[in-house]
Design a protein with these regions (language model features):
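Conserved hydrophobic/aromatic beta-strand scaffold that supports enzyme active sites
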Residues: 9, 96, 118-122
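Non-heme Fe(II)/2-oxoglutarate
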Residues: 1-86
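Conserved active-site beta-strand element of glycosyltransferases/polysaccharide synthases
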Residues: 99
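A short coil-to-beta-strand element that immediately follows conserved catalytic motifs
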Residues: 87-96
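Catalytic core of non-heme Fe(II) oxygenases with the double-stranded beta-helix
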Residues: 102-129
Length: 129
């Protein structure tokens, strides 16, 4: 299917337990970042625990992290399955994780060349009231 349509859907690519673990980890990391930022433990320009990108054209003012170690580990775990499904030898480039807020919408877009083959994974879905 991938070669024909240039995409495929892999259901349950990781276990529910692993998805929950990684999602909880990332939400806790956001809480730590928010606490440290609000208490001024570090500069608002520090991004080691993630950041809120105000100039993001896609989803502004939403917590995100570039190349987080847990997400990089998840990328490597999923690589063999992605190679099997695509029939390609893949070379991991980077990860980018984001916690969407109510009203956030990621519109169809083109990323940089290193994202020629990408994976999008929804770890948890929270219904907003």
């Amino acid at each position: 299917m991938f070669k024909k349509k240039k995409y495929t859907v892999i259901r349950q690519a990781i276990s529910k337990d692993l998805a929950s673990f990684v999602a909880n980890y990332f939400m806790m990391q956001k809480q730590v970042y928010d606490t440290c930022r609000n208490a001024r433990y570090f500069s608002p320009f520090e991004n080691i625990l993630g950041y809120y990108e105000s100039k993001d054209d896609q989803i502004p003012n939403t917590y995100c992290a570039y190349s987080d170690i847990a997400m990089e580990t998840l990328l490597l775990k999923c690589q063999p399955e992605m190679e099997k499904v695509t029939g390609l030898k893949l070379y991991p480039a980077y990860t980018y994780a984001r916690i969407y807020k109510k009203g956030d919408e990621l519109k169809r877009h083109k990323d940089r060349f290193s994202c020629e083959i990408s994976t999008t994974m929804n770890l948890v879905h929270i219904h907003y009231l």
